[in-house]
Amino acid sequence: MKKQASLLFLLALLGLGTGYAQEKRKLTLKEAIEMAVQNSTSADLATTKVKSAELALANTKNNQYPGAKISGQYMRLSSANVKSNLQSNSSSEPAAPLKVDQLLLGQANVTMPIFSGFKLKNSIKTSESLYKAETFAKKHSNEAIGLEVVELFASLYKAQQMTLLIADNLKTAEQRVKDFTAMEENGLIARNDLLKAQLQVSNIKLALDNAKKNAAVANYELITLLKLPESTIVDIDIEAIKKDMAAHPYQKSEGERNDLKALSLQKAAAESEIKVAKSNYYPSLSLSGGYIALDLNNVLTVTNAMNFGLGFSYDLSSIFKNGKQVQFAQSKAKETSLALEQLNEQVKEEVFQANENYNLSLKQSVVYDEAVAQASENYRIVKDKYDNSLSTTNDLLEADFEQLQAQINQALSKADVAQKYYELQFASGQLLNSLQLTQN
């Protein structure tokens, strides 16, 4: 008896362990999007691109400052034959040969660019535009991550609601089978009617298994995106979503899409690149200054040799070669301009379509609410008729199926309204703003 009691206790502990293996976590849409933006690889990539563009801008700006170099050389000379015109000619006797066996040379130079056809100025403008473009691209990336969370939330909620409704319907169907079994045993109904009820139970079980699978897949995709433990089961706070939607109704706004702003800045950068290419037609001027110290052993020592001057350079070949570079820059600018025009048209189409989809979902939701009331009343009437032998088993099972379908459509339509609402906010570039999420 003691062994049996111990075994039962262990089994109970195992059962408790299994029950608590999965952690249920209630999440609002706002919380989930915040987590995704902070933890997702896409967000990290966008942040890294912004940092790279910022460093590229700083690197370009560094070219404004003077360049400074120092150098030194020490060389050993072997049997150098040195003749110097600096030797005195006052003596008629030949000078003793000089022993020159080493050379010391030290230099310090500073160069300051003055003019290069405004190349540096326009290069900085290009880098600034690209940096700003990456910041807006990052914001659009965050919006896209938010939309992905919305879609996963909708999929998970639909699957969870279907699971609940089908499971509830399964209980009713199983109870019907029990009732029909008793009636069949008492000769009140034909065996064929019992088989139809049993077949309905089998079909409902298959639908329930499929709904559970869909819920598990949607839940796994969501927790993977949010970087949550695999044992987490997300419980969607649908009431918080309804409050957010009511508090922030859609407001039409054009020109707010961050991808449009990013591409517009890329266009500005491409136009600056044309000026950079054209700057090669101009000469370059620079100020330079330096210091030289030299010691040629037993011959010459130079110290405090300061120098300064103006540097001038001009690449004559640029007259012939630079034309293609300018044409290339102009072609890239035109390419960006056409891409911006295309994106503008695409955004207008997306906003229009998203608006139509949202309005349709609202209308469908009203119809599905009416359908639930109609299907429930129809089932009640058919059930009364069946109980009074005025309708067939087929009529009863069909009415039950129509009621379940109406309930499922109603639940799915509520999720569709929320999904289409946030898709419209995304198309208008206001998804994160509608949830009062600030972007850095």
List PLM regions with ranges:
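Acidic, low-complexity, intrinsically disordered peripheral segments
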Residues: 6-7, 20-22, 230, 409-440
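Short flexible linkers and secondary-structure junctions
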Residues: 22-151, 285
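Sec/SRP-type N-terminal targeting helices
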Residues: 44-48, 61-62, 114-142, 192, ...
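Bacterial Sec-pathway N-terminal export signals of envelope proteins
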Residues: 20-69, 73, 226-271, 344, ...
